[in-house]
């Protein structure tokens, strides 16, 4: 253990309380000194000079209130040019989420507390319980005081929770009454989701489809099988420089352009600012190839691209091995911390969905075929545009 008394400050460090904030909320930075034994030494805010790169805003002590949105860096300077740097973000609020969106109170006079988090357009969340405006749809059933709901009568109502232009709802049922239906929560559009149309503008255009091959045991009409595959294939090959088939594909005729097909093993493509990684995860890390994790980290580092797209057969939350899912997400988080734009495109099931969490965009592309051998009428593909000014994408129903 280090028991030496604190000495002179030899260097400084900086830590962030709220690295990811949203408009109207502050980020708190703490600057501290370190002596030669790494003892931590208090430094007052007035003794530190702050420079912010990439953002305007105002300071109050160690708290910074951004006046815009985006990513930025804070450079703290103390004494004889000792400096430390911290990165932070301030992105628009995309949606609100209640910790418990459906609650029950047994008796009149009972209470429950409502807790709300706000998530920005990059999927980072922070608590806003004390900032939310609460509105009870039917005050005869209950009232709000702060974030506490008190039941006044048997029945069911919902509480509207509003902040930063977004709303979410909490249904409250008292005394075992029939539950009422609350409106759907609001949400802001993903700023990266835009119309993608191939042009001769120097950008790289990439299309991704889900699984086109039928792998079930049902009976499939041959004419329907060929027609549906050809239809999706034509859409995937249109308006792109490269097509990625994100699942088993039994079309043997050559594509009209460059292509990459998922085959259950590791594959990597480095092309014009984008790193595309094909992974197999459905059998778990012990039954597939665990070396693929080491391989893609090396390949991505060597490529040095700002856009990283993973194409896999399962979304990480559905991995057979929870440890593998956690390990994968830790790697994804590292890329986000480095400022990369990261997509995880899973190809499974019969539904399209998309969500953003902790800076990673998770998108699922449904299979072309249902388990019984009938064609899925809810088929989507993804279109990407990757250029020096960033990446945009568009989900397209085929």
Task: Give the ranges of each region predicted by the language model.
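Divalent metal-dependent phosphoesterase catalytic cores across multiple superfamilies
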Residues: 175-265, 295, 323-341
């Amino acid at each position: 253990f280090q028991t030496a008394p604190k000495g002179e400050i030899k260097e400084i460090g900086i830590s962030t309380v709220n690295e990811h904030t949203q408009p109207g909320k502050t980020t708190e930075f703490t600057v501290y000194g370190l002596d030669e034994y790494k003892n931590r030494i208090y430094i007052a805010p007035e003794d530190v000079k702050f420079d912010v790169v990439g953002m305007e805003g105002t300071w109050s002590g160690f708290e910074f209130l951004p006046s815009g949105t985006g990513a930025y860096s804070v450079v703290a300077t103390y004494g004889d040019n000792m400096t430390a740097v911290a990165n932070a973000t301030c992105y628009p609020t995309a949606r609100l989420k209640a910790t418990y969106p459906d609650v029950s109170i047994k008796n009149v006079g009972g209470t429950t507390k409502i807790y709300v988090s706000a998530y920005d357009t990059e999927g980072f969340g922070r608590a806003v319980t004390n900032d939310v405006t609460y509105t009870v749809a039917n005050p005869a059933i209950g009232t709000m005081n702060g974030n506490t709901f008190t039941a006044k009568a048997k029945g069911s109502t919902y509480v509207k929770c509003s902040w930063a232009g977004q709303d979410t709802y909490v249904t409250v049922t008292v005394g075992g009454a029939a539950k009422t239906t609350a409106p759907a929560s609001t949400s802001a559009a993903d700023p990266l989701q835009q119309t993608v149309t191939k042009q001769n503008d120097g950008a790289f255009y990439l299309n991704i489809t889900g699984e086109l091959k039928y792998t079930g045991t049902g009976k499939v009409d041959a004419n329907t099988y060929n027609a549906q595959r050809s239809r999706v294939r034509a859409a995937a090959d249109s308006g792109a420089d490269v097509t990625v088939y994100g699942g088993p594909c039994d079309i043997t005729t050559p594509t009209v352009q460059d292509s990459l097909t998922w085959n259950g093993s590791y594959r990597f493509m480095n092309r014009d600012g984008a790193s595309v990684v094909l992974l197999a995860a459905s059998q778990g890390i012990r039954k597939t190839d665990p070396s693929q994790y080491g391989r893609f980290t090396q390949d991505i580092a060597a490529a040095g691209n700002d856009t990283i797209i993973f194409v896999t057969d399962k979304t990480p939350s559905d991995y057979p091995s929870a440890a593998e899912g956690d390990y994968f997400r830790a790697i994804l988080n590292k890329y986000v911390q480095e400022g990369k734009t990261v997509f995880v495109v899973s190809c499974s099931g019969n539904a399209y969905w998309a969500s953003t969490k902790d800076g990673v965009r998770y998108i699922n592309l449904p299979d072309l075929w249902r388990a019984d051998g009938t064609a899925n009428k809810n088929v989507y593909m993804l279109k990407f545009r990757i250029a020096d000014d960033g990446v945009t994408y568009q989900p397209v129903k085929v």
